[in-house]
């Protein structure tokens, strides 16, 4: 059986484990919800949602967890602080166990979410997504002042998508406008439970580096590692030109191949049924 020589860190989220050697623990899947134009969102500013429909989607994840043993991050996406409050309240009302990711392209909304989960007493379940080259001093300070101690740490290097380039972002710094490395920033923020993200990029834009970086992260840092590998296909401009042909169907689940390379988290609530069974099958073979 393949094993890493480097000791592998195992992180605990309310009894649910992530990390370790290949096959040591079940894969963790990230089910994203409330993203732009998501079917459950009625008002993206206030966070008004179709609660019944949203709960049905989450219950599907729980059913698959019972069947496969793979647990889930609920990846909550919002662009406004008020919406974050609504979404987090909803999730903590229907589930008191599983962790959730706080994800946004709006720095102010993420900073607000850090403050809110601290005040609400659920920061131990919250994962900041993500510490990357665009993080500003306001968000660094927001994490520091909060009780959030878990974060996705992104290995995205816009100038060099190779393994060396991604490692430079993670461990050396001086890239993407940041003097410090992403791991150094995470430590400064008080992050005790870092999860590495290899920054999946489309084919032709460094996707090979995304694959190889999984093994590099595990071998060098010994930390839980994964990524949103569906981005490789959904952001692939060549594939979009073939959207109406059968070729899309043959490529859209390509991300499951990455299970064979030791990563620990995934992405996407609508297609979770297919990913869950593929993940379980490959995990058993490992």
Predicted segment positions?
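Extended, intrinsically disordered, low-complexity segments
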Residues: 2-19, 24, 36, 266-286
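Active-site beta->alpha loop and helix N-cap motifs at the rims of alpha/beta catalytic domains
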Residues: 9-174
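Catalytic alpha/beta core domains of metabolic enzymes, predominantly
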Residues: 139-286
């Amino acid at each position: 059986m393949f094993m890493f020589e480097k000791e592998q860190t195992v992180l605990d989220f309310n009894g649910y484990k992530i990390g370790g050697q290949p096959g040591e623990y079940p894969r963790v899947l990230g089910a994203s919800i409330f993203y732009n134009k998501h079917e459950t969102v009625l008002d993206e500013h206030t966070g008004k949602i179709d609660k019944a429909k949203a709960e049905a989607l989450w219950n599907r994840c729980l059913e698959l967890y019972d069947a496969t043993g793979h647990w889930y991050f609920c990846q909550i996406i919002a662009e406004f602080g008020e919406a974050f409050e609504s979404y987090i309240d909803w999730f903590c009302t229907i589930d008191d166990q599983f962790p959730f990711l706080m994800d946004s392209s709006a720095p102010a909304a993420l900073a607000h979410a850090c403050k809110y989960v601290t005040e609400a007493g659920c920061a131990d379940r919250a994962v900041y997504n993500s510490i990357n080259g665009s993080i500003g001093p306001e968000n660094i300070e927001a994490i520091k002042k909060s009780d959030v101690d878990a974060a996705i740490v992104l290995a995205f290097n816009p100038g060099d998508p190779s393994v060396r380039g991604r490692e430079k972002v993670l461990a050396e710094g001086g890239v993407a406008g940041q003097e410090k490395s992403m791991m150094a920033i995470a430590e400064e923020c008080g992050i005790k439970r870092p999860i590495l993200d290899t920054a999946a990029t489309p084919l032709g834009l460094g996707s090979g580096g995304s694959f190889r970086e999984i093994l590099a992260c595990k071998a060098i840092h010994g930390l839980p590692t994964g990524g949103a590998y569906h981005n490789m296909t959904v952001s692939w401009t060549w594939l979009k030109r073939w959207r109406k042909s059968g070729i899309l169907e043959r490529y859209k689940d390509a991300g499951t191949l990455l299970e064979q390379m030791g990563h620990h988290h995934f992405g996407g609530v609508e297609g979770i049924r297919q990913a869950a069974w593929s993940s379980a099958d490959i995990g058993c073979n490992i």
